[in-house]
Amino acid sequence: MKEHIAVDRNTYDQVMLPIYSPAQFIPVRGQGSRVWDQHGKEYIDFAGGIAVVALGHCHPTLVDVLKQQGEKLWHISNIFTNEPALILAQKLIDATFAERVFFANSGAEANEAAFKLARHYAIARHNPYKTKIIAFHQGFHGRTLFTVSVGGQPKYADGFGPKPADIIHVPFNDLDAVKAVIDDHTCAVVLEPVQGEGGVTAAAPAFIHGVRELCDKHQVLLVFDEVQSGMGRTGKLFSYMHYDVTPDIITTAKALGNGFPISAMLTTVNIASVMTPGAHGTTYGGNPLACAVANVAFDIINTPAVLAGVEKRHNLMVNFLNDINQKYSIFGEIRGKGLLIGAELKAPHQGKAKDILQLAAENGLMLLSAGGDVLRFTPSLIISEEEIAQGMERLEQVINQLV
């Protein structure tokens, strides 16, 4: 076998399943909030791996723990437990309402576990007909057949044959719509405190409180998908903490491992008690390598300095976006929480988010979209003010080119 195979962007089209349309450059190295491609070109990273690298690329403390654990123990399966997993579970419990933790590898897997648990709990504690799940238009919960069906975006869910039954979608932030469909056959209401893929729309406090009251009235579990909004992204460790409302189940992933694949589902003793050995599982979930990295990432993120810094950086980025908008009048709304920010394009630039992403890459800036009309910003939680300013300068160059 050859020691080195030369690859470029064209190689992707020749060897990969055509389910993505990646940028024309290939990143090969990252440090903090900067990335370099195969040709040495530098980029400011406002994408953060889609809200994953909360502490930036190749954080030295995380690199050290990865090396250290890599020389100890990588994987042993769920037939045994391990120290890093137990330590991480205890940290998550100490920092939240939760009392029990399940580890998996991705947000989709954590959500799959949450939805299965919600149905299993309702059937075990109530009756076999209490299986309806209420979710929201423009929601996103993963790509398994169950999670993509709970997600409220037909463009992702259609075309794969019969979907899991008993899933209803209603408009986000519409409490009356929830009231109209919730009943004693409902097992769960599932929502993102901030819809990420759906356009970076935050839940209104009155809506969250109203949903909690409806869930209590009908003995329904409230599930918060915090895969994108959790782990400090909005300035609190988890977004539910902004609302003075306690969900029954939360899921987290993405920034939990700062890029090393790991996810978790958190719940209470009472709800977890319906699960027995064999009721659910995963081969890789909670492996010592992932949990060792996540332990250190958690320790760094869950500090006053990092969490308070999120709001400061939010204000700085929004101020820059407002300044750009003053000059070019391109955004209809700038919204979001913390460092999960959306800038909605207005006419005549609606639908051009992907074009802006391409222009941004050409100008040395990594950006995201949330649909065709919204630019999404999910940088590192510790990105420097200088890097924010440089990135926004590059964004303004892009907007100037566009208009």
UniProtKB/Swiss-Prot annotation:
InterPro entries: Ac/SucOrn_transaminase_bac, AcOrn/SuccOrn_fam, Aminotrans_3, Aminotrans_3_PPA_site, Class-III_PLP-dep_AT, PyrdxlP-dep_Trfase, PyrdxlP-dep_Trfase_major, PyrdxlP-dep_Trfase_small. SUPFAM superfamilies: PLP-dependent transferases. Pyridoxal 5'-phosphate binds at residues 107-108, 140, 225-228, 283. It comes from the Bacteria. Its cofactor is pyridoxal 5'-phosphate. Pathway: Amino-acid biosynthesis; L-arginine biosynthesis; N(2)-acetyl-L-ornithine from L-glutamate: step 4/4; Amino-acid biosynthesis; L-lysine biosynthesis via DAP pathway; LL-2,6-diaminopimelate from (S)-tetrahydrodipicolinate (succinylase route): step 2/3. It is found in: Cytoplasm. Keywords: Amino-acid biosynthesis, Aminotransferase, Arginine biosynthesis, Cytoplasm, Lysine biosynthesis, Pyridoxal phosphate, Transferase. It catalyses: N(2)-acetyl-L-ornithine + 2-oxoglutarate = N-acetyl-L-glutamate 5-semialdehyde + L-glutamate; N-succinyl-(2S,6S)-2,6-diaminopimelate + 2-oxoglutarate = (S)-2-succinylamino-6-oxoheptanedioate + L-glutamate. One of its GO terms (cellular component) is cytoplasm. The modification N6-(pyridoxal phosphate)lysine is found at residue 254. Binds 1 pyridoxal phosphate per subunit. Pfam families: Aminotran_3 (PF00202). The keyword Ribosomal protein does not apply. Its EC number is 2.6.1.11, 2.6.1.17. N(2)-acetyl-L-ornithine binds at residues 143, 282. NCBIfam families: arg_catab_astC, argD, PRK01278.1, PRK05093.1, PRK12381.1. This is Acetylornithine/succinyldiaminopimelate aminotransferase. It comes from Photorhabdus laumondii subsp. laumondii (strain DSM 15139 / CIP 105565 / TT01). The lineage of its organism: Bacteria, Pseudomonadati, Pseudomonadota, Gammaproteobacteria, Enterobacterales. The gene is argD.
